[in-house]
Amino acid sequence: MEMQFPVILDGATGTELQKRGFTGDMSAEQWVLEHPESILEIQRKYVASGSNVLYAPTFGGNRQKLEERGIFNRTEEMNKALAQLSKQAADGKVWVAGDIAPTGRFLAPLGDASFEELVDIYTEQAAGLEQAGVDLYVIETMMTLTDARAAVLAIRSMSKKPILVSFTCDESGKILSGTDVVAALSVMEGMGVSAFGLNCSAGPEQMLLQLQRLHKYARVPLIAKPNAGMPEIVNGEAVYNCPPEEFVALVPEMLKAGVALFGGCCGTTEEHIAALKAALKDAEYVRPAPECLDLLPAATEKEAFFLPADATHGAVLTADGDLEDKLSDAMDDEWPMVALKLASWADVDALADYQYMIRKPLCLICDDTELLEAGLRAYQGRALYEGNLTEDALAPLVEKYGLLV
């Protein structure tokens, strides 16, 4: 599939379901299956108003979230059925995106999840969406880089369809786990996503500031799916007061910031989508022109680093012995990056356990493709490589993990 930019996404699902009787007493996914006419009405209105892409109502459809609601062993079945409802609403006129959202789980030291557990959770959900025949995938409202990476790997294990990724961040550009959105951009671009951006958390004005930051570094089209302003709590309920004409007032500035996909999150309606369609009439998308194409876009889990090709590291660390102390010392030395040798599976485990200490770009030293891939899979950033492996051996790892060589 080839999108002609700018593309109009859909608007809110959750707040629209609430208008139709959803109270939150059960899983939204279960409620939609019991009230299919609600999502069909919502999404048909979005199509009529100008949406080119519908998000399947599978936001909370991963196994973790379903089990928290007492729903077991139905992940694939429910995701397939929910996505088929969106296919019905689309009626072949627009694309349907399988919607994947946070698990709410964290890796150590913040939580007890393993990365492979997250991949497994998302793989089950993606399988149901793929069976339904979705046209693309959207990974949205991401609050940790680990969830986003796991979701991309899960999707790529069964599909080559386009993947859109959007995070939610605070006014400083940090997501819940402390990752800067520029670091998330670097990692996601390296993993081959088709577009990157922001959704939820803010209205258009606040979101624009972070999109302008991203524009300086983005090599892919950007996504803007803001709320209808910041909510006010009225009688215990969140009320969004940004009218359609105000919602689209900054569309010209967003286009200048490289935004190619526009939509609405919480509080937006078909009227906001219609306003977007009008605002984007005859608009021309200008692809981002990053300022740092000659630099290497490395990243830790938290921060982005743009390095010259001749950047160097100090002594190569080995994972045997006390890696914790070695990393602590390396973070305080004068070298711009840290190098770690992977010579065994125990080394990969050590990297996974102590990567939270890494605050510099990481260069992996390894001559075994299986070990190197395991290290790249475990490392929640974007690493550089040094070693004797051939370009042909490295090519799949560059494509899959964004390895910098």
Regions found by a protein language model. Give the residues of each.
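Domain-level signal for soluble alpha/beta catalytic cores
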Residues: 1-405
